[in-house]
Curated annotation (Swiss-Prot):
GO CC list: plasma membrane
Membrane-spanning residues: 69-89, 106-126, 136-156, 166-186, 197-217, 225-245, 301-321, 336-356, 381-401, 409-429, 442-462, 478-498
Gene that produces this protein: MFS2
Gene Ontology MF terms: transmembrane transporter activity
Native source organism of the sequence: Trichophyton rubrum (strain ATCC MYA-4607 / CBS 118892)
UniProt keyword Glycoprotein, yes or no: yes
Protein name: MFS-type efflux pump MFS2
Keyword check for Transmembrane: yes
SUPFAM superfamilies membership: MFS general substrate transporter
PROSITE patterns (UniProt xref): MFS
Length: 595
């Protein structure tokens, strides 16, 4: 009877849930959802297990293409806005120094403390998202970002401004962690590449556009209007996000659905994930989010070396926000607005890299197909090799052509290879870390994010000292030598990566897990053949294998995307915190029906 009802449910078209109701009521249900034959008997001992129903109108994977892409652009803009706010502040730096009689190093803290706040994202907001959902987190943190920006515009002294900038960065870091999770909630891995690419470019475009906007606004209206504009911008994004972003996190949606069904029917309903994996407690969430990234960072050479490489590149980007004013404003006499235009060279390199990345995604898709969806992680590295070579070329070129005796266009063009290589290195290495650590990818990404945020905060602090003591040529050469020292890393991991991963504890466990998934895939294909010959006989083992395979393939997205990764709860979403066993049986219980 239950099978008949299920077949009938599959044929029926569920009632749609209006967008406004999805935004305001995450637990909204339809008659089809209420009457669906969930497994269980509805008692405390054997509750109904709530899962997605066929063609579920509330499943983010079933959103229309228009809705998916609208949400993608909203979260990408939300991410870009935060990154832009981090650097636009520099446009009013001269006026801030004059008004508060502050040294250049103190002024630079306004950037450093904001970027330091980015380290909060994966440690605090990721577990909060896990517990309370993505929508509520966006609403609260972006409102706080807007408020702190507005407060900064009215700061009576330098200390207040710096404190408000730090809190703005801390709360603003939420989209950097959770926006990718929203995209992963809506798109299967095979369709996620372009969406993740759009999201991934935001953290690079924002810092480059910031000095351009902040520079012109600062010199025409003053630094307080720079902060005021940032408050208005973030406020508009907050309003748009509050209107267009429904809750997309499946565990939270199904948990709220279970609560609603229990209230409506008087029976006991529970989310399948909460029953099979155990409801995640606040202590568990924060313990994993706060501790495991550090364990992976200091015990896994792969994570430490590649994260350090990416942190150096990221720190160099933020170093330029202090270096370019010295090179172009002090030595060439440019105004802050015109000086901000110097970043257009970096911008051009970033855009060129995104084109190359899209082409490389096609290459990787072919390679992945040859390996039946299980391409070695090292196949992610070819573009990192190209980008790794481009970065020192651009930095050395810039270092020795940035003097006023050489035409300004030469040094600006020289910054393009840096922007080009930066994006290729970031996207490629992020994908490599995700594929190499699958079930631990979220913690790896968290470690990577924290380390690069620390470098991004630290590099601007010593930049002016370095340029004063060494001069603009040798000071610009130091990050070039650092980048040059890191050039061999992608080569070495491309050649020896497989052997290195087997010798690393967590990478080895992830590799063993992938081998089991490959076996599960083979078992599934064999069971499909048996079913086609013998009829639709239920096979629990093949079902579990399929569910596990779906989950891990969902995790192996590329920004396809920097993708992130296997992560948090194990839904295969790299932006969620890891709380899963490497055992196949354990993972198979948290099946794809929760998505």
């Amino acid at each position: 009877m239950a099978d008949a009802n299920a077949m009938e449910g599959e044929k029926s078209i569920p009632t749609k849930i209006p967008h406004w109701r999805q935004v305001t009521d995450p637990g909204a249900v339809t008659p089809e959802i209420i009457n669906y034959p969930y497994p269980g008997s509805g008692t405390e001992a054997d509750p109904y297990l709530v899962q997605w129903i066929p063609s579920d109108p509330r499943n983010p994977m079933n959103y229309s293409a228009v809705k998916k892409w609208s949400i993608t652009f909203v979260v990408a803009i939300a991410t870009l806005a935060v990154a832009l706010i981090s650097s636009a502040y520099t446009g009013g730096a001269i006026e801030i120094a004059q008004e508060f009689h502050a040294d250049a190093e103190v002024i630079t803290l306004g950037v450093s403390l904001f970027v330091l706040g980015f380290a909060i994202g994966p440690l605090i907001w990721a577990p909060m998202s896990e517990l309370f959902g993505r929508q509520l987190l966006f609403f609260g943190t972006y409102l706080a970002l807007t408020a702190f920006n507005a407060g900064a515009a009215g700061s009576p002294n330098m200390a207040t401004l710096l404190v408000l900038r730090f809190f703005a960065g801390s709360f603003g870091s939420s989209p950097l962690t959770n926006a990718g999770g929203v995209i992963a909630d809506m798109f299967p891995a095979s369709h996620r590449g372009l969406a993740m690419g759009i999201f991934a470019i935001a953290p690079f475009l924002g810092p480059v556009l910031g000095p351009v906007i902040g520079g012109f606004l600062g010199e025409s209206a003053g630094w307080r209007w720079v902060e005021g504009f940032l408050a208005i911008f973030s406020g508009v994004v907050w309003i748009i996000g509050s209107i267009f972003l429904p809750e997309t996190y499946p565990p939270v949606l199904l948990r709220k659905r279970a609560q609603r069904l229990s209230k409506l029917t008087g029976k006991v309903y529970a989310s399948r994930m909460d029953i099979e994996q155990g409801k995640l407690s606040i202590g568990q969430a924060f313990k994993t989010a706060l501790m495991r990234p550090w364990i992976l960072l200091f015990r896994e050479p792969i994570v430490l070396l590649l994260s350090t490489y990416m942190a150096i590149v990221y720190g160099t980007l933020y170093m330029l926000f202090s270096a370019f004013p010295v090179v172009y404003q002090q030595h060439r006499g440019w105004s802050p607005g015109i000086g901000g235009l110097a970043f257009l060279g970096v911008l051009g390199g970033i855009l060129a890299a995104m084109v190359i990345n899209l082409l490389d995604n096609k290459r990787y898709a072919k390679v992945s197909k040859e390996y039946n969806g299980f391409a070695p992680p090292e196949e992610r590295l070819p573009v990192a090799i190209i980008g790794g070579i481009a970065i020192p070329i651009g930095l050395f070129w810039f270092a020795w052509t940035n003097g006023p005796q050489i035409h300004w266009i030469v040094s600006i063009i020289a910054s393009a290879p840096f922007g080009f290589g930066m994006v290729l290195v970031f996207l490629s290495l992020m994908n490599y870390l995700i594929d190499a650590y699958t079930i631990y990818a979220a913690s790896v990404l968290a470690a990577n994010s924290v380390l690069r945020s620390l470098f991004g905060a630290a590099f601007p602090l010593f930049t002016r000292y370095m340029y004063q003591n060494l001069g603009i040529h040798w000071a610009s050469t130091i990050p070039a030598f650092l980048a040059l020292a890191c050039v061999p890393f992608p080569f070495l991991f491309y050649i020896y990566g497989a052997n290195i991963r087997k010798r690393c504890k967590f990478a080895g466990e992830a590799d063993a897990f992938m081998q089991k998934l490959m076996q599960a895939n083979s078992a599934h294909l064999e069971s499909d053949l048996e079913v086609s010959e013998a009829g639709p006989i239920p096979r629990r083992n093949s079902l579990e294998a399929r569910e596990v395979l779906d989950r891990i393939q969902s995790a192996r997205s590329g920004l396809t995307r920097t993708r992130t990764a296997a992560t948090v709860e194990y839904e295969g979403n790299p932006y969620d915190i890891d709380r899963v066993n490497t055992g196949l049986s354990r993972v198979s219980t948290t099946n794809s029906q929760t998505r």
